[in-house]
Amino acid sequence: MACNSSGCESGCYDREKDNGSKIVDDAVSGGGNHESVCVKCKCNAPMTFGDGGFDDGRFCADCFRNNVFGKFRLAVTSHAMITPSDNVLVAFSGGSSSRVSLQFVHELQIKALKNYEASRDRSLPVFGVGVAFVDETAAFPALSTEMIDAIEWVRYTVSCLSPPAKDLHVVPVESIFGSDSLDARDRLLKLLDSVPDDTGKEDLLLHLKMLSLQKVAAENGYNRLVLGSCTSRIASHVLTATVKGRGYSLSADIQHVDARWKVPIVLPLRDCVRLEITRLCLLDGLKTVELACRSQCGINDLVSSFVALLQEENPSRECTIVRTAAKLTPFYFNKIPETDDSNVPMATQRRLKRFNLKYDGSMTTEAFCPICNGPLNRSDSSELDTFEEGQESDVLYAACCSSCRFQILPQDGSSLEQFSSFLPDHMISQVKHQKVDSQAYLREKIKDCLLLDDEEVV
């Protein structure tokens, strides 16, 4: 990729005011060896970040940024993540990955707007962009002040982006429990308190956040949900899922596209490591905010620390973990659904058919865990057929994956009954639908052995 000396063209109003240029100048001046040149363009001085990365001091500012943006753009175009007719919701947590994801989506929108204005027929519309921030104050009351400051910072960051304007949705995590905020907050706290395991509590909150994002996306007409998950986070997820016994559903979580949800999820930063993203934030002066909402004593934090240690010893370790896991067979929903909509350009429809992943028909599943929404093997959900309608807690236990049974669900019957009463209505309805689907599947398999109403036993 050739060096682009014209700059980033991000369109951010306050880039200079936030001292982004000063950061770049300081980084370049700290390079030490001014006689060396960028290994890509062979003309500009390389950047030196001093973070100990294996490629530190090899690329100039423009080439480094173009390299990271090129990975993002390749993922978007190859998997048809964003098309002109789409309405995209970017999940923004304030961290470095989500900040870069928002910036890159913003730049794609600016380019689409310029192409639209320069076109004579203006046949390709400009895709819409919204931003969603999940407010976790109800789950972490001690961080209420920090959360308020973070929300104000998010509002300011989104407002500083140049036109087209982007709607910001601040979503309380308890909103999925109902419109009554007090009752919803009470149910959330009781639900989390009923989970005895720290890792299970953290995982449950993560699932509730995803439901909150899906809810706001569906209610506001978005058809894509962009997450900022990078290679580093996915590598950690591969190991944690393996430790938790989620091997069957692992391949569903690590693909570029996940359409098992009502609003498909896309991961355009899947091929970018955290070090690259952190450097880009420093280079472009992209400010971030981190909230200490994560448990420091669970499996997730332990595995993240382990992967970070591996990465220090071998800079390619995270990529190796993700590439190895990517060899698993994807599910049928790990692709953007093909469409015959006349509003979608033919080039986009051809791209969907060309780049969609090939999957094994045996990986087709209609059963999903009501807690984590992980795909279930038919043998895992066969216990649903043995319960009556009145045994709601037992049906819930049978409908969940083995990992959620072990880490999230209470083990004794009375606590499980209480736990199920606190769950959001969405999860309860999914359990009921799953039981009906399981019974229909069982009837389909044994239909040749059933007698019709007008038949007699011989």
From Swiss-Prot:
The keyword Repressor does not apply. It comes from the Eukaryota. GO terms for cellular component: cytoplasm. Gene3D superfamilies: HUPs. It holds the Pfam family CTU2. Keywords: Cytoplasm, tRNA processing. GO terms for molecular function: nucleotidyltransferase activity; sulfurtransferase activity; tRNA binding. One of its GO terms (biological process) is tRNA wobble uridine modification. It is found in: Cytoplasm. Pathway: tRNA modification; 5-methoxycarbonylmethyl-2-thiouridine-tRNA biosynthesis. Coiled coil: none annotated. Plays a central role in 2-thiolation of mcm(5)S(2)U at tRNA wobble positions of tRNA(Lys), tRNA(Glu) and tRNA(Gln). May act by forming a heterodimer with NCS6/CTU1 that ligates sulfur from thiocarboxylated URM1 onto the uridine of tRNAs at wobble position. PANTHER family: CYTOPLASMIC TRNA 2-THIOLATION PROTEIN 2 (PTHR20882:SF14). Belongs to the CTU2/NCS2 family. This is Cytoplasmic tRNA 2-thiolation protein 2. It comes from Arabidopsis thaliana (Mouse-ear cress). The gene is CTU2.
